[in-house]
Curated annotation (Swiss-Prot):
Subunit annotation: Component of a cohesin-like complex composed of ScpA, ScpB and the Smc homodimer, in which ScpA and ScpB bind to the head domain of Smc. The presence of the three proteins is required for the association of the complex with DNA.
Name of this protein: Segregation and condensation protein A
Subcellular location: Cytoplasm
Lineage, top ranks: Bacteria, Pseudomonadati, Pseudomonadota, Gammaproteobacteria, Lysobacterales
GO BP annotations, alphabetical order: cell division; chromosome segregation; DNA replication
Similarity comment: family membership: Belongs to the ScpA family.
Biological source species: Xylella fastidiosa (strain Temecula1 / ATCC 700964)
Keywords, comma-separated and alphabetical: Cell cycle, Cell division, Chromosome partition, Cytoplasm
Function: Participates in chromosomal partition during cell division. May act via the formation of a condensin-like complex containing Smc and ScpB that pull DNA away from mid-cell into both cell halves.
Pfam families, A to Z: SMC_ScpA
InterPro entries in the record: ScpA (IPR003768), ScpA-like_C (IPR023093)
Main location: cytoplasm
Amino acid sequence: MNSERAQIANPPTQTPVPQQQEIPLAMVHGQPVLQIPQDLYIPPDALEVILDAFEGPLDLLLYLIRRQNLNILDIPVAEITRQYVDYINVMQELRFELAAEYLVMAAILAEIKSRMLLPRPPDIENEEGEDPRAELVRRLQEYERFKQAAEDLDALPRMDRDNSAAHAFVPDQTTVRIPPPVNMKELLLALQDVLKRAELFSGHAIRREALSVRQRMGDILAHLEGGKFHPFTALFTAEEGKLGVLVTFLAILELAKEQLLDIVQEASLGPIYIKSLATHHTNGALQLSSDFDNSPSTHVPP
């Protein structure tokens, strides 16, 4: 009896159930602000800045759940609904049209809360029925997957945001390839080849025709009109014999000395090409002269 009276006099203390921590509206000087001060002035457009952080009702609901590290599969509907409605009330006070789409989610939360509070019929009390939160959990999980995928895509480098294309003006430049100069040894080898071919031709000369180096210089310039390269061997006529070949060769040397010819060779022992430079030096008649002739100078028309 004494022990029973002691128990009645000193009833056992019950362990208090920990309450869920309320999310503060803001932190001021390190102190949480749970309610909006009555004398706080909020500009009419301030809510637009707040709502920019949320992309819809599901985003706000997911924020409330993740903020408190709650299990999305076991949502405390009563507390989440209360916090959600608090946000809706703030929205309605400032800008009702912005909070309209959030009212639908508030109604869904209220319905789920009421379904969980209503007693179940005795006949299905022992049966495992569908959780009223199942559809909401499914929508939240699906939304979270899409949101994570969008954040992953946004983290990828983007042109004109993370990278900039480099633009540089490159002037149009035409590459002029200057052929290498011809070695005198190569030129003599080419002359030797022409002389060998001239020996293959034989004829009966009735009288010797005087060959002029100056005249041959004019013939060569006339043959090279147009400024194009011609083969070295194309300037020689084998039928003229060795004398004609030598006169042509001397005329080429005289023109090269006067810088009226451009003689090039692509590679060693390769073919030799000649181009006239007369049009680059003068637009009038050329005065040609040679130390090998005693006759008057030859004039070449332009």
